[in-house]
Amino acid sequence: MTDSLGELRAVLMEVRERLGDALGYAATARDRLSDALGLLSDLDGQHSEPLVPPELRRARDELERGLQLISGGAAVVADIGQRL
């Protein structure tokens, strides 16, 4: 039983690390998309057609949603780890 518990703790620790990495990468992607949206929006006034494709806004919104899901998953994994 001790080996199984130790293995579970090790797996949970790795999952926590990977979720932390995922949070960082997704946050960076969201920030870069927001920067791009801001720049394109500023240039919109100089063009006859909108420069910001709707897909870009959706991608930013989906990244935000993904961040919330990853964060929730990380909290659950941390809680499980503390209870072991």
Task: Outline where the language-model segments fall.
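Amphipathic alpha-helical hairpins/coiled-coils and adjacent low-complexity
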Residues: 2-84
